[in-house]
């Protein structure tokens, strides 16, 4: 089968950059963001308003429980997916009512940061303006429970997709205990690919065995010709795995050929790729699991497992395609001056004669100076399609948004990536991996052109 060339006009070194993805889940640090600042929680008493609260006709059983069931309990239910805080009962919700109101009003919760007017996405658990107002009013009125005998019907909670079968299960080569002396431990582990024939990965589900310390995982696919480079990195460190940040390590040549295979963040479920498409893996390849452990969750060990749905019959071409300006990666052109607000930079890529592909999802990545970011297509006919826009960037909540309808790109279209930052520090910033550095990156799952409805 023919393989379309990558639309990227630059070397693929930028594939090795960090992206804290929530595949289709709740993201990281759920409990912290729900409850708000500890001082705020203490001031509020950690619960419903005291005397003098305004009155309301809204109650938990009649009005609020359906909202929570659909948009909150995927993370904050009795068996929530990584949020850590159970808000499935009127008693628990009332206990946290005022912090909940603050988080909902500020749009920190639920952690759905895609702009409402950009596009439509699968599994949208965001709150409408009307539902936000209801939650805030109910909380500030003392979080009344209402009558359970006349409770409204509860819609099902959003749950991430699951693999319909698992053809291959891989795990870290050893159980690893992160260094408790540092809050963040980035560690890469080389994992053998056991199949002796061409294969196409059509779905992934990454499952850390200790979610209390696992912050995120990125799986990189290393082609056979570059395996020796990563084996040398692994052998050079006496401890399990080897240290890494921003990618799997490797030299500039190997970073041009490695690809992304999957990613995970707390609350995330399986990534199921579009029907008839898959990521090709050649015999002799290896995987690198980049683990980001956060030891603030307590001590402990982890041995992350990766479930894969795999086809041995050829699938339609697909790639996890990053977008950024290679000049930024090389330290040119993405200057963010000290003590300056509203600094924006933009990257454009014009689709050439051979570029015909479809976007199926999109994710954006910046660091903590980020204010807003967007990815859109300016079509040759003058129309424009927004893929993803995040107007209030939150470093703690980064996820991949799966488009309800794929967006086709044809020759002459332009893909436009734009990022804006506020640099409140006394140091100039530019592209880099440190906490005082910044990035502007988008990643997308692309395939051959997709039939339009």
Protein language model regions, located:
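Sec-dependent bacterial lipoprotein signal peptides
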Residues: 1-24
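Ser/Thr-rich, Pro/Gly/Ala-heavy low-complexity intrinsically disordered linkers and tails
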Residues: 23-57
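Short sequence/structural segments immediately N-terminal
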Residues: 56-73, 80-82, 92-95
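Non-transmembrane alpha-helical segments in soluble domains
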Residues: 65, 69, 73, 101, ...
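The canonical Cys-X-X-Cys-His
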Residues: 67-79, 87, 109, 135, ...
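Acidic glycine-/aspartate-rich tracts in secreted/extracellular proteins
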Residues: 78-81, 115, 142
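Beta-strand-centric surfaces of beta-sandwich/beta-rich domains
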Residues: 84, 114-121, 149-358, 363-453
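Extracytoplasmic electron-transfer domains, predominantly the class I c-type cytochrome c fold
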Residues: 91-139
């Amino acid at each position: 089968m023919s393989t379309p060339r990558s639309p990227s006009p630059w070397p693929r070194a930028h594939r090795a950059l960090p992206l804290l993805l929530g595949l289709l889940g709740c993201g990281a640090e759920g409990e912290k963001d729900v409850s708000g600042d500890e001082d705020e929680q203490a001031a509020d008493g950690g619960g419903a308003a005291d005397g003098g609260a305004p009155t309301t006709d809204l109650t938990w059983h009649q009005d609020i429980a359906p909202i929570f069931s659909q948009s909150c309990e995927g993370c904050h239910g009795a068996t929530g997916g990584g949020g850590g805080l159970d808000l499935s009962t009127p008693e628990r919700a009332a206990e946290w009512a005022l912090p909940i109101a603050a988080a909902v009003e500020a749009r920190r919760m639920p952690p759905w940061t895609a702009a409402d007017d950009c596009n439509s996405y699968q599994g949208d658990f965001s709150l409408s303006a009307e539902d936000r107002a209801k939650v805030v009013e109910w909380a500030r009125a003392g979080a009344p429970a209402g009558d359970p005998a006349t409770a409204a019907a509860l819609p099902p909670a959003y749950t991430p997709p699951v693999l319909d079968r698992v053809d291959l299960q891989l795990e870290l080569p050893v159980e690893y205990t992160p260094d408790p002396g540092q809050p963040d431990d980035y560690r890469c582990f080389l994992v053998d690919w056991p199949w002796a024939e061409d294969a196409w990965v059509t779905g992934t589900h990454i499952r850390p065995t200790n979610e209390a310390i696992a912050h995120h995982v990125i799986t990189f696919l290393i082609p056979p010709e570059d395996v020796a480079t990563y084996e040398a990195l692994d052998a050079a460190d006496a401890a399990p795995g080897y240290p890494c940040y921003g990618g799997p390590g490797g030299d500039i040549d190997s970073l041009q050929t490695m690809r992304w295979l999957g990613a995970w963040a707390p609350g995330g479920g399986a990534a199921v790729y579009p029907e008839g498409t898959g990521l090709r893996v050649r015999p002799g390849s290896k995987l690198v699991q980049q683990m980001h452990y956060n030891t603030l969750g307590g001590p402990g060990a982890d041995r992350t497992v990766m479930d894969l749905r795999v086809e041995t019959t050829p699938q339609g071409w697909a790639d996890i395609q990053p977008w950024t300006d290679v000049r930024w990666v090389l330290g040119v052109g993405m200057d963010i001056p000290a003590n300056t607000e509203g600094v924006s930079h933009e990257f454009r890529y014009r689709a050439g004669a051979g570029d015909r592909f479809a976007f199926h999802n999109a994710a954006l990545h910046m660091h903590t100076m980020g204010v807003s970011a967007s990815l859109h297509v300016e079509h040759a006919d003058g129309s424009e399609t927004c893929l993803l826009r995040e107007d209030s960037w939150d470093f703690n909540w980064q996820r991949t948004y799966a488009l309800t309808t794929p967006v086709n790109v044809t020759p002459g279209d332009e893909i436009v990536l734009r990022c804006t930052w506020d640099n409140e520090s006394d140091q100039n910033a530019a592209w880099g991996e440190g906490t005082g550095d910044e990035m502007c990156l988008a990643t997308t799952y692309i395939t051959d052109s997709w039939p339009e409805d």
